[in-house]
């Protein structure tokens, strides 16, 4: 069990922001917690699941996680859900309605923005949801604040009958800092009490609740002005002052230690009066916020036209000292500090790649062989890497589950150039259960000519191997019912004869199955069945090696894409017709090889054989 779970009150621990939030949620007496894994928020629920006296689950998607938390709150329990920024897009339907209905038990939503897009398809700013939904937004700058704000958010939620957004960023989620923890409070569950006028959100009922939602925002404005989470770090250099929030506060303090800084933790509603007070004391006021100029716009709308923000600073990425110092010093007309120059060396190229023996490679190896004749709509997951070398076998990746709808759109919008091309959708098991089922049903319903590949590797791989409804395991590893994908897609209307379940390691079968199904003008589903090589379900067997004298340099094994296979020698050979063949002679890292044998099946001259264990040769 982790040190955070065992820690006694007043203990000081080194915790990531995610672990600190989990401790704060537990100490606040929360009883229900739900999430769908998504970087950088994943570890919050993983950590929460270790605490006693709390129910925690992986939900099939963020909307369901939100609804589970809402149900807990309606029943009088303190409830929590977590997601990455794009997850709130999925959950927004339920979220935007519960903001009108309000809460019984405190309801806290942790939303982690991926500033800098280290693992996301966009950089949207979740603070917008506070404005949109008229709910308070809290922004921690470090792990200690993340812990404290998580606890406070439940009190705030219950006191003002509102969900509360805890806006995080990748930096807060993953950086570790010292946190002093406290005691768990007891919060009794009152139980669900039927109240149709409040919980049955018909137009008539919702109209009656809207005035309270609007009035609540004014009360929250006054609360933000007096909140101890908003404080001034005074400074002697009055030429410039800063208003900032989140981890940008740390960067501002490091960059300009002598300047006054108004640090906002309760960031919506914006405490305008506090900002006006600082503005009166400095020559120039700069709003430093990641990523969108939300506070800047609202302060200007309140009449503070002289402030600066995104006219000096970028809207993209983290606002680190390397960004702040040159921008602000140039604005002040000061010389930039001397920098130490070092010889510049280009880093060794390390493109993202799949793991050795990843079962997805067999699918993309086959798709790459028929690339000229297919349009391929991809999805979110490890298999997004199929867009890269050596496969180049994806045409689109937009959002979770989008492969289905986009593939249908491609099918219905064929041109003269594409009318004879097959349309393929590629989606993973967890993503299919998250948001792909509806898309497949739409393909069936609208008679689409799409071949759907469901890559079942029995895990949510990209975020770290979390369980889901298709693994047969829950958040804590306990046994649960496992979805049968064959029966599921048949229930969605796919004809039984158009459903294939194959082993992605058997390359001839993969190629023949895809070729057969793409030639048939109706919806078909191919389910690959091999566990992720990093999961508990995978069994490693004896590795392979290349016999140098038998290798012809054809490069077929390289095209499988396995990182255990590398080129050790290249040659150019002139053919009798004058064309030049580039030969690639390969070797296999036996320490990395798991014995999947995909490379063996790709090798025409049979130059790849089982490597003998060293002890067997003695």
Model-derived segments and spans:
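Thiamine diphosphate
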Residues: 1-143, 235, 259-261, 301-527, 537-539, ...
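Short helix-loop-beta junction
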Residues: 47-53, 252-262, 488-495
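Short beta-alpha connecting loops at secondary-structure transitions
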Residues: 54, 112-116, 133-138, 308-313, ...
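Conserved thiamine diphosphate
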Residues: 114-163, 169, 201-207, 352, ...
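Flexible, low-complexity linker and terminal segments
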Residues: 2-18, 22, 28, 140-354, ...
